[in-house]
């Protein structure tokens, strides 16, 4: 069994986006700790299973981040279930989880399932608009969400999502300082090794996504943070 708490770097692949076999191999053989498959929209059973079968050729952990019940399937090492804590829509708190449990609860291995407490902080992102996330949060707000995630909900993971833009370092630091047991994931705007280094010194784990599709060489360089975080 893989130990998620030791992961420092992950690549996130969107099943709705195309990626060449060459680039996929480069990602999977790059020494990243894991591949996450997940997206905000146009995530279907067909495109998830297609991408999963391609990644499965390589010997590294594979995670499905569940965004709808229809795309859930066996074959992943772990399943991450996001709950958007700053969403105004209860669908993104627990309704998707409820539907998943009704359909698959009798066959789920709960050792493979991890709840993620998401805080979405880029107001202009697609995920913020779809989830109706309230993003105008100050330091005290994000500290309270961190406390909520760790002390009350006892989430194993808190995910700070800036989705497409680089985050406010002070806010991410404030969240990190509140967490002792909950693992902090950071995703958003990591487009080069300098940003990867900066965020990897704050968060436990960084998630690199969009840059994969814009500049694969820059994406691959972000894995170098593991050398300085040994």
UniProtKB/Swiss-Prot annotation:
This protein's source sits in the domain of life called Bacteria
The first-level EC class reads: transferase
Keywords linked to the UniProt accession: Lipid biosynthesis, Lipid metabolism, Magnesium, Metal-binding, Phospholipid biosynthesis, Phospholipid metabolism, Transferase
Secretion signal, residue range per the UniProt entry = none
For activity, the cofactor(s) needed are: Mg(2+)
The catalysed reaction is:
sn-glycerol 1-phosphate + all-trans-heptaprenyl diphosphate = 3-heptaprenyl-sn-glycero-1-phosphate + diphosphate
Family statement = Belongs to the GGGP/HepGP synthase family. Group I subfamily.
| Name of the protein in question | Heptaprenylglyceryl phosphate synthase
Q: Which organism does this record belong to? A: Staphylococcus epidermidis (strain ATCC 35984 / DSM 28319 / BCRC 17069 / CCUG 31568 / BM 3577 / RP62A)
Upper lineage ranks?
Answer: Bacteria, Bacillati, Bacillota, Bacilli, Bacillales
């Amino acid at each position: 069994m893989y130990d998620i708490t030791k992961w420092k770097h992950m690549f996130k692949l969107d099943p709705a986006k195309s990626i060449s076999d060459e680039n996929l191999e480069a990602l999977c053989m790059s020494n990243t700790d894991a591949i996450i498959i997940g997206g905000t929209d146009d995530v279907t059973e067909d495109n998830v299973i297609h991408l999963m079968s391609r990644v499965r050729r390589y010997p590294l952990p594979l995670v499905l981040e569940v965004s709808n019940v229809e795309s859930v399937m066996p074959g992943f090492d772990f399943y991450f279930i996001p709950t958007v804590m700053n969403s105004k829509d209860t669908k993104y708190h627990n309704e998707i989880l409820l539907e998943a449990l009704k359909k698959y609860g009798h066959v789920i291995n709960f050792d493979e399932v991890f709840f993620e407490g998401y805080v979405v902080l880029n107001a202009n992102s697609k995920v913020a608009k779809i989830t109706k996330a309230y993003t105008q949060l100050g330091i005290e707000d994000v500290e309270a969400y961190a406390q909520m995630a760790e002390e009350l909900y006892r989430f194993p993971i808190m995910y700070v999502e800036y989705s497409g833009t680089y985050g406010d370092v002070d806010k991410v630091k404030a969240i990190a300082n509140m967490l002792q047991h909950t693992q902090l994931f950071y995703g958003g705007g990591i487009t080069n090794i300098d940003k990867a280094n900066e965020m990897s010194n704050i968060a436990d784990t960084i998630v690199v996504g969009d840059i994969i599709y814009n500049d694969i060489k820059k994406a691959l360089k972000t894995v170098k943070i593991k050398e300085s975080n040994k």
